[in-house]
Design a protein with these regions (language model features):
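Generic detector of short, locally flexible boundary/turn motifs and exposed helical patches
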Residues: 2-3, 10-14, 44-47, 107-112, ...
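Noncatalytic regulatory segments and standalone regulatory/sensor domains
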Residues: 1-4, 136-142, 148-236
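Predominantly the structural core of cysteine protease catalytic domains
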Residues: 68-175, 224
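Charge-rich, low-complexity amphipathic helices
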Residues: 44, 51-52, 59-60, 93-95, ...
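Alpha-helical structural motif
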Residues: 30, 64, 129, 206-209
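Active-site nucleophile-adjacent alpha helix/oxyanion-hole segment immediately C-terminal to the catalytic cysteine
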Residues: 1-89, 97, 135
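Short coil/turn linker and secondary-structure boundary residues
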Residues: 45, 124-128, 205
């Protein structure tokens, strides 16, 4: 980690040099994103003791963004979690994606939100403009983002594998999926990200399509700003 800061006016292209981590299960995409921003020894610890740490955190094969914020705090990673809903949107009960986890997770998630401030977990209510996301990336810091995978259309994947509509094909209207934003191209209006459902590769998406995927109902527009600077890389 390291590197100098730069503003949006100074950098048209930013691409952070962050090691890729592929998820091992259907439910741990957010945990894989956490691993990507950890130091190597911390990443190894979380990987080796994943189920033990999940048990200690009260996570049972379903992670919410508040859980990721608590994990970042556990590993001493400065962060800021922004969401439009402090708690659980009651409307999620009608969403197929949440139907199997809402009952078991509802109370636990509410309690984590209520205790966040005292625990040192930074949570703010509100929406995030694309300009704020771009500014953060231009300062060489990554972002953990909740998206609707059904709308996550990678331009690179669409060109090389045109039969794929999105990076994570699925049939339900909403399929929650975490990705790690690692850069942007201001001239081409692209955001670079790592998708933990794939093996190591850098995906990219247009600004407008990213907004569509991250602001889809079901995401609560959840954004975690990670305040750790990384070196930049020259090529994809």
């Amino acid at each position: 980690m390291g590197g100098s800061r730069g503003g949006m006016d100074e950098q048209n292209l930013v691409l952070l040099n962050i090691d890729h981590v592929q998820q091992k299960h259907t439910w741990d995409c957010g945990l894989a994103c956490i691993m990507m921003v950890l130091q190597p020894h911390e990443r190894e610890l979380l990987s080796l003791k994943l189920f033990q740490i999940c048990e200690e955190e009260g996570v049972d094969k379903s992670t919410w963004t508040i859980d990721l914020a608590y994990l970042l705090h556990r590993f001493g990673i400065k962060h800021r979690y922004v969401t439009v809903t402090l708690g659980v949107d009651p409307g999620f009960s009608s969403e197929r994606f949440y139907s199997t986890v809402l009952n078991k997770d509802h109370q636990r998630v509410l309690e984590r939100f209520q205790k966040a401030s005292k625990q040192g977990v930074v949570v703010e209510q509100g929406g995030v403009a694309l300009s704020e996301i771009l500014s953060h990336l231009c300062h060489q810091m990554p972002i953990i983002l909740l998206t609707n995978a059904h709308l996550l259309v990678c331009e690179k994947c669409a060109r090389t594998m045109p039969h794929l509509r999105s990076c994570l094909p699925c049939s339900p209207p909403y399929q929650g999926h975490y990705i790690l934003l690692i850069g942007c191209d201001m001239k081409k209006n692209l955001i670079y990200y790592r998708n933990p459902s794939f093996s190591s590769r850098v995906c990219y998406i247009t600004f407008s399509r990213l907004d569509e995927a991250r602001q889809s109902y079901g995401t609560d527009e959840d954004v975690i700003f990670v305040y750790s600077q990384f070196e930049t890389q020259v090529t994809l």
